[in-house]
From Swiss-Prot:
Keyword Transferase: yes
Enzyme Commission code(s) on record: 2.3.2.27
Name of the protein this chain belongs to: E3 ubiquitin-protein ligase pellino homolog 3
Species lineage: Eukaryota, Metazoa, Chordata, Craniata, Vertebrata
Entry similarity comment: Belongs to the pellino family.
Positions of post-translational Phosphoserine modification: 11
Length: 445
């Protein structure tokens, strides 16, 4: 048996890992340590799951929801690296993991493990994200299927880790948030087995990747009207940034990207191999439209009394309070290839191309004919612009800047594929642009 302590493990290159709190997730209603009675706690930021348009199909409940605000906890729950042990027998490894000490275990072989222990850090909070419903997980995330909705039921094969990742937030200004792969389990341990990608860093420390990986993309130019998609990277257990592996579960890591960090920015995307999350900062959310603004835009669009150019019936976007069940009688429909907006009609089908293919009576272009739905998750919008564009082929409506940004943003799919998708429902985008400008006809009177 060899037990070697290494005090250098707490150097700045090692992540400031965190201790999961017993309080559960700290959302907007949780009191902050320094918040006075009736005041909101300091908010670090918000996580929004793509594909739900503001609410889970079954409703937002507890830690399982489509959106979660991370706020300062009543008491810091941080831990930081303390000592690194080289273990030559599995018995000692088991003894260490059972002491209640927070640690990361790197199994190098059947007879050799490296365990990094952590001590309390009063300057940081941690929030854990994953598929597990255990108390140490603050935000329970399940797989999102293309077209909206979660993959549910015991037969569903999830690719999201039970303890997928953790976000560490500084308790003092500027409240920087950093993301790390993997989260602590019920025994306060992060375990990387023999098959996991792991290695010794140049300064003698350990690092590794999770099985399916945690990918992050920071937008170029911030999350605003001038934003452009960034480059997808993989985040390690210790928070280092690497280029992507050949596939999500490959054992060979990518190259270290030294000039990039794991600090979350407004608009950063986090992919957990089954669900993609958007990080919004408090400052960024101030620039985003509010639900009241989105409702005002809906009422303004309906007040213009758009008409079906063929049936001459007045069209109107339904209230979001109705939910997305079946299209309303006055619901606008669109030919997604050309953008001409009509009321619903049952003619113009092209049987040789399937029931969803229709011929536009105005321009004769043939393509999908779908109802229009307003995007209701305000945090996904880049600007408060008018609802002028729709994603193809799902028909979700938003501003031009928002539509063009998401249509140009490739989202991870499967083990190595990327595909642009509607942020409101998760449907894969089609066509040359992925979105279309809507062409309404005003009232004839």
């Amino acid at each position: 048996m060899v037990l070697e302590g290494n005090p250098d493990v707490g150097s700045p290159r090692t992540s400031d890992l965190q201790h999961p709190g017993s309080q559960g997730s700290c959302i907007l209603s949780c009191p902050g340590e320094e918040a006075l009675a009736g005041e909101e706690p300091i908010k670090y930021g918000e996580l929004i799951v793509l594909g739900y348009n503001g609410c889970l199909a079954s409703g937002d409940k507890g830690r399982r929801r489509s959106r979660l605000a991370l706020s300062r906890r009543p008491h810091a729950n941080g831990v930081k690296p303390d000592v690194m042990h080289h273990i030559s027998t599995p018995l000692v490894s088991k003894a260490l993991s059972n002491r209640g000490q927070h640690s990361i275990s790197f199994t190098l072989s059947r007879s050799h493990s490296v365990i990094v222990e952590y001590t309390h850090d009063s300057d940081k909070d941690m929030f854990q994200i994953g598929r597990s419903t255990e108390n140490m997980i603050d935000f329970v995330v399940t797989d999102t299927s293309p077209g909206g909705g979660a993959t549910e039921g015991p037969s569903a094969q999830s690719t999201i880790s039970r303890y997928a990742c953790r976000i560490l937030c500084d308790r003092r200004p500027p409240y920087t948030a950093r993301i790390y792969a993997a989260g602590f389990d019920a025994s306060s341990n992060i375990f990387l087995g023999e098959r996991a990608a792991k290695w010794r860093t140049p300064d003698g420390l350990m690092d590794g990747l999770t099985t399916n990986g945690v990918l992050v993309m920071h937008p170029a130019g911030g999350f605003s009207e001038d934003s452009a998609p960034g480059v997808w990277r993989e985040i390690s257990v210790c928070g280092n940034v690497y280029t992507l592996r050949d596939s999500r579960s490959a054992q060979q890591r990518g190259k270290l990207v030294e000039n990039e960090s794991n600090v979350l920015q407004d608009g950063s995307l986090i992919d957990l191999c089954g669900a993609t999350l958007l990080w919004r900062t408090p400052a960024g959310l101030l620039r985003a439209p509010t639900l009241k603004q989105l409702e005002a835009q809906r009422q303004e669009a309906n007040a213009a009394r758009p008409q079906c150019p063929v049936g001459l019936s007045t069209l109107a976007f339904p209230s979001p309070a109705r939910g997305r069940t079946a299209p309303d009688k006055q619901q606008p429909w669109v030919y997604v290839r050309c953008g001409h907006v009509h009321g619903y009609h049952g003619w113009g089908c092209r049987r040789e191309r399937g029931p969803q293919e229709r011929e536009c009576p105005l321009c004769r272009l043939v393509g999908p004919y779908v109802p229009l739905w307003l995007g209701q998750e305000a945090g996904l919008c880049l600007d408060p612009g008018p609802p002028s564009h729709a994603f193809a082929p799902c028909g979700h409506v938003c501003s031009e800047k928002t539509a063009r940004y998401w249509a140009q943003t490739p989202l991870p799919h499967g083990t190595h594929a990327f595909h642009a998708a509607c942020p409101f429902c998760g449907a894969w985008l089609t066509g040359e642009l992925g979105c279309v400008r809507l062409i309404f006809q005003g009232p004839l009177d």
